[in-house]
Amino acid sequence: MTQGIPAVFLDRDGTINIDHGYVHEIDDFQFIDGVIEAMIELKKMGYALVLVTNQSGIARGIFDEEQFLQLTEWMDWSLADRGVDLDGIYYCPHHPDATEEQYKKSCDCRKPQPGMLLDAQRELSIDMTASFMIGDKLEDMQAATLAKIGTKVLVRTGKPVNTEAEQAANLIINSLADLPKAIKGIKK
């Protein structure tokens, strides 16, 4: 039986794009410098790229699910136009303190819960121990731990890095742009 493919699980806001807070408009979406080139390199290295993003702005009524899906489609096409094909896109619109009742719940998909990562594992046949989770928050690291992802990578491009997040990570880098080089260093 094959183990599956290795993946890089990617948080969105603060990891792929600049986190302006509840980004939901195309005009507000800015890729962080170097991330597209890094994703191209990661694909060449044999990694599936899987987006896993909490989107509590939906639950809070800041934007609706349709707006999120439109932005996500634009982002996906923008990446594809530059040679990056995402293998999976998973999002959680829920929040326990939601103002929008249909999204008000404690769920297993909202990070730090591992639901999105485990769904991707099942649907894409991912080898979790050979995979990486990259994000800017403690919740990203906690979800990766619960999903038994091999390497947890914290980036400094998003929320301010705190001690607890640093301790939960296996590796801390400045940006997703640095991940291919970091992986090559680990694999030596």
Curated annotation (Swiss-Prot):
It is found in: Cytoplasm. It catalyses: D-glycero-beta-D-manno-heptose 1,7-bisphosphate + H2O = D-glycero-beta-D-manno-heptose 1-phosphate + phosphate. One of its GO terms (biological process) is lipopolysaccharide core region biosynthetic process. Its EC number is 3.1.3.82. The keyword Manganese does not apply. Its main location: cytoplasm. One of its GO terms (molecular function) is metal ion binding. InterPro entries: HAD-like_sf, HAD-SF_hydro_IIIA, HAD_sf, Heptose_bisP_phosphatase, Histidinol-phos. The keyword Cytoplasm applies. Zn(2+) binds at C92, H94, C107, C109. Keywords: Carbohydrate metabolism, Cytoplasm, Hydrolase, Lipopolysaccharide biosynthesis, Metal-binding, Zinc. It holds the Pfam family Hydrolase_like. Pathway: Nucleotide-sugar biosynthesis; ADP-L-glycero-beta-D-manno-heptose biosynthesis; ADP-L-glycero-beta-D-manno-heptose from D-glycero-beta-D-manno-heptose 7-phosphate: step 2/4; Bacterial outer membrane biogenesis; LPS core biosynthesis. GO terms for cellular component: cytoplasm. Belongs to the GmhB family. This is D-glycero-beta-D-manno-heptose-1,7-bisphosphate 7-phosphatase. It comes from Photorhabdus laumondii subsp. laumondii (strain DSM 15139 / CIP 105565 / TT01) (Photorhabdus luminescens subsp. laumondii).
